[in-house]
A protein has these predicted regions:
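Positively charged n-region of N-terminal signal peptides that target proteins for export
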Residues: 1-6
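Bacterial N-terminal signal peptides
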Residues: 8-20
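Outer membrane beta-barrel
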Residues: 38-207, 212-232, 236-243, 308-338, ...
Length: 414
C-alpha cells in the first residue's frame, strides 16, 4: 500500500515537472498586436488597429458678404447718424472646425468630438461643438448616444452646415430648430432602413450651457425613406443612379430651445411645444426639400398672458446644369412670429449657384436674395421676435422693408 502511494506521488511529481516548462513557455508567448493601418487617401487621416480607430478631419468656410439694409443706420456717433447706410462688405471665416471620431476598446463603442476654432457660443466661450459617446451594438439596428450633439428636430438643422445647398440655412432654422444641446438619444431603423425613429431628452439650455430650469426638453422623430436610405446631404452632387424620397415628422416639448427660458425662472418655467414636417427628394440632377413648423409658447410665468403661436416654412429646389459639377437653386421661406398679429411676417427669397470639385468637400457657393419684413413686424413682442432675423436700427417704421444680401463662400473639408 505504502509502495503504491509512493509510486503515485512520484508519478505526479514527474508529471508536474514535465508540464511546468510547457506552461512557462506558453505564458511567455503573447499574441501579436493587431496591425496598425494609416489611410490619408481622402484628405483626412484615419488610423486603425483592431477595434480601435481614430479619424482626424477638418472643415473651413471662407465667406464674403455684401449686405444692403433698407433704411438701416448703424451709426451711433459722427456725421452718419440719421443717414441710411450704404452696402456693407465683409470677409469672414464663420466656421473653422476640427473633428476626431472613431471607436475604442469594444467594437460597439464609438466616439465623435468636434471643436470650432472660429466663433462659438456657450459658457466660458466654449469651443466644443460635439462630444458624443455612442453605443452601437454589433449586428443591431439601434444605438444610444449621450453627450452634446444636435437635437433630432428639423431636417435642415441636422444636415451639416458643410452640406447645405445654399451658403447657409434658411431663416426658419434659428426660430424653430433646437440645434445642439446636452442629453441622450435612443434611435434605430428597420432592417431595410426604410423606417427610422429617434427619441431623446436634453437640457434645453442650448449649446455648451448647463441646465437652467427644472423641466427638460424632450423630442421624438419618425422618418420614412420608401425608395431607400436618404443621406443627410443637400443638393445632387452626391446623388446615386436612382432617386430617393424622404418623409418625416418630429415633435418636441418642455424647455424653450437655445436657452430662451426667461432668466431667473427655474421652477414651473414656461413650456414650448413644436411640430415639424419634413420632405426631401433627390435624383441624379434634381433636388428639393421643404419643411413646415408649428410652435406654441406658453406664457404664464412670471406674467400670465395668452399662449403665443407661431408658424413657418421653407422650400427649395435645385437642378444640376452640369451633372455633379454645377448646380442652380432657389429658396423661399416665411415665418409668422405671432399668428395673431396681421401683416407681421418675415420672408426670405434667394437664388444660388454651386460648383463642386469633390462634392461638398471642395466647393464654392454663391447666393443672392432678400429678407423682407412686413409693415407690422415692429409691433411683435420680444418673445415673438426670438430667433427671427434682427432688423436693427431703422430710420422708418410701419412699412415693408427689404434687405438685399450677396454671399460667396469657399469650403474645404476632409
Amino acid at each position: 500500500m505504502r509502495a503504491s502511494l509512493k509510486f503515485l506521488l512520484f508519478s505526479f511529481a514527474v508529471a508536474l515537472l514535465a508540464v511546468a516548462p510547457a506552461r512557462t513557455a506558453g505564458a511567455g508567448q503573447q499574441a501579436a498586436p493587431p496591425e496598425t493601418k494609416v489611410d490619408a487617401s481622402n484628405g483626412g487621416v484615419t488610423m486603425s488597429s483592431g477595434v480601435n480607430s481614430l479619424t482626424i478631419g477638418a472643415r473651413a468656410q471662407f465667406r464674403w458678404t455684401v449686405d444692403k439694409r433698407e433704411g438701416f443706420d448703424a451709426d451711433k456717433l459722427g456725421s452718419g447718424v440719421g443717414i441710411s447706410d450704404g452696402p456693407l462688405s465683409q470677409f469672414d471665416i464663420p466656421r473653422l472646425r476640427i473633428g476626431l471620431s472613431g471607436g475604442a476598446f469594444r467594437p460597439w463603442m464609438k466616439y465623435s468630438f468636434q471643436f470650432d476654432i472660429s466663433r462659438t457660443a456657450g459658457e466660458s466661450a466654449s469651443k466644443i461643438k460635439d462630444a458624443i459617446l455612442e453605443i452601437r451594438p454589433t449586428g443591431k439596428t439601434y444605438r444610444i448616444q449621450a453627450g452634446q450633439f444636435k437635437v433630432p428636430f428639423s431636417l435642415q438643422q441636422i444636415t451639416s452646415s458643410g452640406r447645405q445647398q445654399f451658403v447657409d440655412r434658411s431663416i426658419t432654422d434659428s426660430k424653430f430648430a433646437p440645434a445642439r444641446d446636452m442629453g441622450v438619444v435612443f434611435s434605430g431603423t428597420t432592417t431595410s432602413r426604410k423606417v427610422g425613429y429617434e427619441a431623446g431628452v436634453f437640457n434645453g439650455a442650448g449649446e455648451s450651457n448647463r441646465q437652467t430650469r427644472e423641466s427638460p426638453l424632450w423630442v421624438a422623430r419618425v422618418i420614412v425613406d420608401p425608395m431607400g436610405p436618404y443621406g443627410l446631404v443637400e443638393g445632387s452632387s452626391d446623388a446615386g443612379d436612382k432617386p430617393v424620397l424622404h418623409l418625416g415628422v418630429a415633435a418636441r416639448g418642455g424647455a424653450q430651445i437655445r436657452g430662451r427660458t426667461t432668466a431667473g425662472v427655474v421652477q414651473d418655467a414656461d413650456n414650448q411645444t413644436a411640430v415639424d414636417v419634413e420632405f426631401a427628394y433627390k435624383a441624379p440632377r434634381f433636388y428639393s426639400t421643404a419643411e413646415a413648423y408649428w410652435m406654441t409658447d406658453e406664457r404664464h410665468n412670471p406674467v400670465a398672458l395668452p399662449d403665443l403661436k407661431s408658424m413657418g416654412f421653407h422650400a427649395q429646389a435645385g437642378f444640376m446644369v452640369v451633372p455633379r459639377r454645377a448646380e442652380v437653386a432657389i429658396r423661399f421661406a416665411q415665418i409668422e412670429g405671432d399668428t395673431s398679429v396681421d401683416d407681421a411676417a418675415v420672408s426670405e427669397v434667394r437664388g444660388a449657384f454651386g460648383y463642386y470639385w469633390r462634392a461638398h468637400n471642395l466647393k464654392v457657393t454663391a447666393d443672392i436674395g432678400q429678407v423682407s419684413y412686413d409693415a407690422g413686424f415692429s409691433s411683435l413682442s420680444a418673445r415673438a421676435r426670438a430667433g427671427l432675423p434682427a432688423p436693427g436700427t431703422r430710420l422708418v417704421t410701419g412699412q415693408t422693408l427689404a434687405d438685399t444680401e450677396f454671399r460667396v463662400q469657399f469650403q474645404l473639408a476632409f
